[in-house]
Every structure is written in structure tokens, then in C-alpha cells.
Swiss-Prot record:
GO terms, biological process: glycine biosynthetic process from serine; tetrahydrofolate interconversion
Name of the protein: Serine hydroxymethyltransferase 1
Record-listed (6S)-5,6,7,8-tetrahydrofolate binding positions: 121, 125-127, 354-356
Protein's cellular compartments: Cytoplasm
Originating gene: glyA1
Gene3D superfamilies (alphabetical): Aspartate Aminotransferase, domain 1, Type I PLP-dependent aspartate aminotransferase-like (Major domain)
Family: Belongs to the SHMT family.
NCBIfam families: PRK00011.1 (NF000586)
Organism taxonomic ancestry: Bacteria, Pseudomonadati, Pseudomonadota, Gammaproteobacteria, Pseudomonadales
Length: 417
């Protein structure tokens, strides 16, 4: 029998110390990684619940194990809320991650060797959209589209490639593209060549849920997303679709038993919590502020003479090219880290450096907006970053910025009393 008093602090001091250090880092550092956010205590409560003990292979009402009557209720809540949130007819809440959701879509609708047309990783796409190092690039014939000289997707080029290569599936989505995707145009191109349209909205799902970014569900054959990032839930995946019995059956089978065994019901419960949070009016206000903050930061970089890819942002993220400054993303990332500002190095279009070094940085505002930053704080923050980028070896500037960061983080904590 377990004692409820047996906490990690009492049982495993080494592990607890590292966990406490990470919690302190999250409070004292400014988080600007576009794919990161802070979940609510309710989301974390669900993830740490007794649901982690329950195995539940199958789907609600069709399980292979007994004792699933309550996890059936929980999973159905998550399904119903996801469908309501995104206006979908179908939702599968079982994928453990966004990449696994994407793999399940490919497994459901493609055969090995089929051609897919997705956005190049070097131009802002994702590994799972056909990158050569990913299974999506190894199992399928991946053709890539990119952005033009102005940093925008060239839809005429997408159409030309689609007509030339006749893909079985067109993938629309990104990990580092700051503009609005034209879902009607993607749909028209897919229809022209008889392809499935698959949209990966992992980065903008929260914006979509709040109505501040176009919803791809009415246009796509299938949509996937993560449940963290802008959606501000647990780390996990989600598949959505319009009513289509054949596709729904294929998707369910591709998730279980095709690519996963038992679902993580404690994470599914946390997804249900985050979907409920996203259905509240204040969530729209939050997402509107996320975009305002990203625009404010990008504007400062442009004013200070830096190159923002695509010339600005219409969502929660943007890419900063440091090619003109001859600064590597790796070195810039490290210098900002010493100032308690967390970013990620990122390749930029026509990057002369390797993906392990890069010539760019990716910024995102979901996390800082969660902790209460508005345009004024974001403009000030962007100015501090510019000061550091002006001389990565000026430790006096880095030290001064670090003290400012600690002060503003203390003023705007992630988790209040």
C-alpha cells in the first residue's frame, strides 16, 4: 500500500532538486521558444492523477480491457470539446504527440512510396512534412515547396509542383512561418490534382480556436495539431476531420492499433481541461494579445535594423535572420541564455550555416503572454535582445539585462499565490 504522504521530495531528493531547479528556471527566465507555453494547474493536476494507472486500449465503448467506464466518460468529454472548439465532426484525442498524429494520418491515407508535397524544413516547414531525416521523407516520395524572395509561400509554385508531381497528399503547415496560410487556395490546388489536403495547425491551434487565425477544418480532409504550444494544454496530439465515415475509420485504425497501443488517459483528461479552457471568452483575449505581442516585438527588431523573415508576423512567431550581422544562431542563443532569455536557434532561408549552427533565431510570444506581458513589456524585451545582439561578448550588457529580466519576471510570475 502506498502512503499519500510519500512525496518526491521525501523519496528522491536528487530528482526533486532538479525538478525544483526547473520550476525556478521557468519563473526566473523569459520564455520565447514559439512551441512552448505554461499549462494551468488544472492541466497539471489531471496529468498527475490516478488516471495514469489505467490501461484502455480501444475507443470509448469499444475497449479491450474492463474497468473503462470512467475513462470512457473522460475521453468522450475530450472528444466532444475538441469537436466543439474547432467545428469538427470527428476528433481523435489519443495521439501521444503531434508527430505521432501526423504519422497516423500518413498511415491511414497513403501507401509507402506515395508522393507528398509539403513545406521545406529549410523554409519553415516541419520534420514530419517530408524532411529527409524523418520517416515522412523516408517512407514517402517527398516533394518540397518553399517561400519566395519576400518570405511568402509562392502558391503558383505550389500549384506548379502539384501538377508536375501529382502528389497523393498536399501538406499545409509550418514550424517557422509567420504569415497566414491560404487554406482555400491549398484546397483548390489539391482538388485540381486529386490529392488529399492535410493541414498541420500545431503552431496556431490556439489562435484558430479563438478565431484570430483562419480555421482549416472546413477546407482540409484531415487536420492535426499538438495540444500544447498556443493551445496551452498538455504535450500531446489531436486529429480532426469533417464527416467522412471512410476517412474516420481509417484514422481510428491508424492510431490504434496501427501506430499506438494504450492511450494515455491522464493526458487525455488534461486535454479535456485545456479544451474547456479554450472555450472560455478570456481565451480569445489571450490569443489576441499573443499576436499583438509578436507584432510589437517584430517591429522593434525591424526598427533596429534586423531582418525579420517575411517582413513581420501575422501570428504568434517570427524568424530573425542574422546573416547580415554575420552572427550565428547558436552563439546568439547562448548569449541570450546567459541573460535568462530562452530562444531557439533556427535556420533561415538561404542560410549559409548548418542546422546545428544556423544564422537565425525563432521567437514566439505564447509563454510571455501567459505570464502577463503586453506590448510595452514586449517592446522593452525586444530592445534588450537587440542590445545583446549588438555585441555577444559584452558581459556587462548581458549582466544588466539579466537583472532586468529577473525583475520583470518577479513582477509577472507564471504561477501566482
Amino acid at each position: 500500500m502506498f502512503s499519500r504522504d510519500l512525496t518526491i521530495a521525501k523519496y528522491d531528493a536528487d530528482l526533486f532538486a532538479a525538478m525544483e531547479q526547473e520550476a525556478l528556471r521557468q519563473e526566473e527566465h523569459i520564455e520565447l521558444i514559439a512551441s512552448e507555453n505554461y499549462t494551468s494547474p488544472a492541466v497539471m493536476e489531471a496529468q498527475g492523477s490516478a488516471l495514469t494507472n489505467k490501461y484502455a486500449e480501444g475507443y470509448p465503448g469499444k475497449r479491450y480491457y474492463g474497468g473503462c467506464e470512467y475513462v470512457d466518460i473522460i475521453e468522450q468529454l475530450a472528444i466532444d470539446r475538441a469537436k466543439e472548439l474547432f467545428g469538427a465532426d470527428y476528433a481523435n484525442v489519443q495521439p501521444h504527440a503531434g508527430s505521432q498524429a501526423n504519422s497516423a494520418v500518413y498511415l491511414a491515407l497513403l501507401q509507402g512510396g506515395d508522393t507528398i508535397l509539403g513545406m521545406s524544413l529549410a523554409h519553415g516547414g516541419h520534420l514530419t512534412h517530408g524532411a529527409s531525416v524523418s520517416s515522412s521523407g523516408k517512407l514517402y516520395n517527398a516533394v518540397q515547396y518553399g517561400i519566395d524572395a519576400n518570405g511568402m509561400i509562392d502558391y503558383d509554385e505550389v500549384e506548379r509542383l502539384a501538377v508536375e508531381h501529382k502528389p497523393k497528399m498536399i501538406v499545409a503547415g509550418f514550424s517557422a512561418y509567420s504569415q497566414i496560410l491560404d487554406f482555400p487556395r491549398f484546397r483548390a490546388i489539391a482538388d485540381k490534382v486529386g490529392a488529399y489536403l492535410f493541414v498541420d495547425m500545431a503552431h496556431v491551434a490556439g489562435l484558430v480556436a479563438a478565431g484570430v487565425y483562419p480555421n482549416p477544418v472546413p477546407f482540409a480532409d484531415v487536420v492535426t495539431t499538438t495540444t500544447h504550444k498556443t493551445l496551452r494544454g498538455p504535450r500531446g496530439g489531436l486529429i480532426l476531420a469533417r464527416a467522412n465515415a471512410e476517412i474516420e475509420k481509417k484514422l481510428n485504425s491508424a492510431v490504434f492499433p496501427g501506430s499506438q497501443g494504450g492511450p494515455l488517459e491522464h493526458v487525455i483528461a488534461a486535454k479535456a481541461v485545456c479544451f474547456k479552457e479554450a472555450l472560455q471568452p478570456e481565451f480569445k483575449t489571450y490569443q489576441q494579445q499573443v499576436v499583438k505581442n509578436a507584432k510589437a516585438m517584430a517591429g522593434v527588431f525591424i526598427e533596429r535594423g534586423f531582418d525579420v523573415v517575411s517582413g513581420g508576423t501575422e501570428n504568434h512567431l517570427f524568424l530573425l535572420s542574422l546573416i547580415k550581422q554575420d552572427i550565428s544562431g547558436k552563439d546568439a542563443d547562448a548569449a541570450l541564455g546567459r541573460a535568462f532569455i530562452t530562444v531557439n536557434k533556427n535556420s533561415v532561408p538561404n542560410d549559409p550555416r548548418s542546422p546545428f549552427v544556423t544564422s537565425g533565431l525563432r521567437f514566439g510570444t505564447p509563454a510571455v503572454t501567459t505570464r502577463g506581458f503586453k506590448e510595452a513589456e514586449c517592446k522593452e524585451l525586444a530592445g534588450w535582445i537587440c542590445d545583446i545582439l549588438a555585441d555577444l561578448n559584452n558581459e556587462a550588457v548581458i549582466d544588466a539585462v539579466r537583472e532586468k529580466v529577473k525583475a520583470i519576471c518577479a513582477k509577472l510570475p507564471v504561477y501566482g499565490a
